[in-house]
């Protein structure tokens, strides 16, 4: 089939690679415009953009898919289908209806739970035991379309957003070609989403990522894992030059107790509202990710220090 692929992050790269390998004609790849990245904040293409260019595929990076010019350009592609994976833009009706078979989205949750931008992070933070990937027909509503195919994925007790991301990307990449084959043969069954159990995975903002040490340790551990590596759960530690922001990237729940937010030893054991958290990996501003021993060697935090 003649397919357009719309995606931006690493999660979508895995899916695009599988579609290319499955033999479909990728007519055009759409991705978000180049954005400032890294310490120098130089403009760099998205992972999908860079991957597609490496394969010699045509790439478009519109600021908006809603302009008359972009809509007309998309319609002119004469597509059989469009596949959308974490693209990052809303598609209007004229775009959704342009391909012969329609536009299809791979979503990283079991809808209607966790509609929206951050389903992987939200599932871990909420303590869900199971998530999954689903292929759905896109509608004008946010992740509201009927489901074509679905596969569950268990969330392990030590999963981070990064590890669960990789699991879901691999499963989703295998599911997409199967779904497209059924779409091409017009034998796919579409199931409307349930009206009950709708939740929204809104984007994680910095203020929400801050650790609240008054919460139980198990909840804080999920918070840390769900936001690792990005955007990173964080707290502030005192220093001679003022508060220093520290990202907590890997942790372990322990039984020791004390005043919430207080360090119980000099090796990053921190009291919570219930139990305690042992930080295993951390990152302070301007530094790389370090294990606890390396971190405390360069930035000692004494027993009894109060963290904010």
UniProtKB/Swiss-Prot annotation:
<dbReference type="InterPro" id="IPR036477">
    <property type="entry name" value="Formyl_transf_N_sf"/>
</dbReference>
<protein>
    <recommendedName>
        <fullName>Methionyl-tRNA formyltransferase</fullName>
        <ecNumber>2.1.2.9</ecNumber>
    </recommendedName>
</protein>
<comment type="similarity">
    <text>Belongs to the Fmt family.</text>
</comment>
<dbReference type="InterPro" id="IPR002376">
    <property type="entry name" value="Formyl_transf_N"/>
</dbReference>
<dbReference type="InterPro" id="IPR044135">
    <property type="entry name" value="Met-tRNA-FMT_C"/>
</dbReference>
<dbReference type="InterPro" id="IPR011034">
    <property type="entry name" value="Formyl_transferase-like_C_sf"/>
</dbReference>
<dbReference type="InterPro" id="IPR041711">
    <property type="entry name" value="Met-tRNA-FMT_N"/>
</dbReference>
<dbReference type="Pfam" id="PF00551">
    <property type="entry name" value="Formyl_trans_N"/>
</dbReference>
<comment type="function">
    <text>Attaches a formyl group to the free amino group of methionyl-tRNA(fMet). The formyl group appears to play a dual role in the initiator identity of N-formylmethionyl-tRNA by promoting its recognition by IF2 and preventing the misappropriation of this tRNA by the elongation apparatus.</text>
</comment>
<dbReference type="Pfam" id="PF02911">
    <property type="entry name" value="Formyl_trans_C"/>
</dbReference>
<keyword id="KW-0808">Transferase</keyword>
<dbReference type="GO" id="GO:0005829">
    <property type="term" value="C:cytosol"/>
</dbReference>
<dbReference type="InterPro" id="IPR005794">
    <property type="entry name" value="Fmt"/>
</dbReference>
<feature type="binding site">
    <location>
        <begin position="109"/>
        <end position="112"/>
    </location>
    <ligand>
        <name>(6S)-5,6,7,8-tetrahydrofolate</name>
    </ligand>
</feature>
<keyword id="KW-0648">Protein biosynthesis</keyword>
<dbReference type="GO" id="GO:0004479">
    <property type="term" value="F:methionyl-tRNA formyltransferase activity"/>
</dbReference>
<dbReference type="InterPro" id="IPR005793">
    <property type="entry name" value="Formyl_trans_C"/>
</dbReference>
